[in-house]
Amino acid sequence: MKKIGYLGLGAWGYCLASLLASKGHKVVCWTTKPELAKHLTDTREHPLLAGHLSKGEMTFTTDMSEALKDVDMIVESVTSAGLRSVFEQVRSLGLPNCPIVITSKGIEQDTGMILPEVVIEVLGEEFRSLIGFLSGPSFAQEVIRELPTSVVGTGYTVEVIQEICETFMTPTFRVYPNTDILGVAFGGALKNIIGIACGISDGLALGCSSKAALMTRGLHEIRKLSVACGCKAETLNGLAGMGDLCVTCSSPISRNFRFGTLLAQGLSTEQARNRIGMVVEGAYTCVSALQLSKQHKIIMPISEAVYNIIQGTIKPIEAVSALMKRTIKEEHL
């Protein structure tokens, strides 16, 4: 069994750390919040996952060097905006020669880089062969209850991909190997924008037909931009693309979906963010996606509408009307 250093203790991080511990791995979890580390040590229950006690051997610390000492694998679940600074800390401590698994979803705003590439830029090109990525349709609230879930494990080498699958796989958590790390990362990041759009649709009570159109045309936008950036189209049709899109666009468990619903109900962006109480990755990814779309001359009307609503330059119902009045064109899926 492995000793695993886990960075980040939001709901998703705690959920995956608990899953790994339940398999017999020793998991040392790092957080920047002393009160959270103490609470988890005392209760074994995460505030965002009430009623679900952790299983197996888990310890909690605010000392990153303690979390990374003599580990066989590093896993992270921090925000996309905080990823670079976290791995700058990791680099300063020195690194063991072990796989590093990224589970955060997003695109870095200033660079337009997928998160595995951000980590490689920080740590050095020599670490590329150790980097992996786990993504797909999954909610912490469901995985912690051991409801059947299927995701994708990817990386830059077959060896790391295989190790991710073997390390995370359980009878209720299935991990499919995939060699297209770029496509998996883009699918996991861009679907959050469409999740906000579908939340807006629900908040405006526009019905199922509206949501179906947003999901279908949204996937088209995701696929166009992703392929232009070097991804394989078939990856976006799988769990990391269409699969993740489905759960994000159809469930209030998704914070991106809830964020969109709140915007449709008249809350400002700041008010909606405060109500959610957690990072809404789609709001940040929207900026990066539109920057990339301009570079590649890709038209993304749904993503642009979401961005304008978030910026407060157009009302949600006006954005819907503008989308419906666009010039007639071939569907071109």
UniProtKB/Swiss-Prot annotation:
| Subcellular location, principal | cytoplasm
Q: What is its EC number?
A: 1.1.1.94
This protein's source sits in the domain of life called: Bacteria
Enzyme type, top EC level? oxidoreductase
Under which pathway is this protein filed?
Membrane lipid metabolism; glycerophospholipid metabolism
GO biological process per UniProt = carbohydrate metabolic process; glycerol-3-phosphate biosynthetic process; glycerol-3-phosphate catabolic process; glycerophospholipid metabolic process; phospholipid biosynthetic process
Residues involved in sn-glycerol 3-phosphate binding: K105, G136, S138, K191, D244, S254, R255, N256
GO CC field: cytosol
Q: Which reaction does it catalyse?
A: sn-glycerol 3-phosphate + NAD(+) = dihydroxyacetone phosphate + NADH + H(+); sn-glycerol 3-phosphate + NADP(+) = dihydroxyacetone phosphate + NADPH + H(+)
Q: Which SUPFAM superfamilies match?
A: 6-phosphogluconate dehydrogenase C-terminal domain-like (SSF48179), NAD(P)-binding Rossmann-fold domains (SSF51735)
Q: What InterPro entries would the database entry show?
A: 6-PGluconate_DH-like_C_sf, 6PGD_dom2, G3P_DH_NAD-dep, G3P_DH_NAD-dep_C, G3P_DH_NAD-dep_N, NAD(P)-bd_dom_sf
* Pfam families (UniProt xref): NAD_Gly3P_dh_C (PF07479), NAD_Gly3P_dh_N (PF01210)
Q: Where is the active site?
A: K191 (proton acceptor)
Where would you find this protein in the cell?
Answer: Cytoplasm
| Gene Ontology MF term list | glycerol-3-phosphate dehydrogenase [NAD(P)+] activity; NAD binding
Q: For binding NADPH, which residues are annotated in this chain's numbering?
A: W12, K33, K105, A140, R255, V279, E281
Record keywords, A-Z: Cytoplasm, Lipid biosynthesis, Lipid metabolism, NAD, NADP, Nucleotide-binding, Oxidoreductase, Phospholipid biosynthesis, Phospholipid metabolism
**Similarity annotation:** Belongs to the NAD-dependent glycerol-3-phosphate dehydrogenase family.
Instruction: Please describe what this protein does.
Output: Catalyzes the reduction of the glycolytic intermediate dihydroxyacetone phosphate (DHAP) to sn-glycerol 3-phosphate (G3P), the key precursor for phospholipid synthesis.
Q: Sorted alphabetically, which PANTHER family does this protein's record hold?
A: GLYCEROL-3-PHOSPHATE DEHYDROGENASE, GLYCEROL-3-PHOSPHATE DEHYDROGENASE [NAD(+)] 2, CHLOROPLASTIC
The protein, known as: Glycerol-3-phosphate dehydrogenase [NAD(P)+]
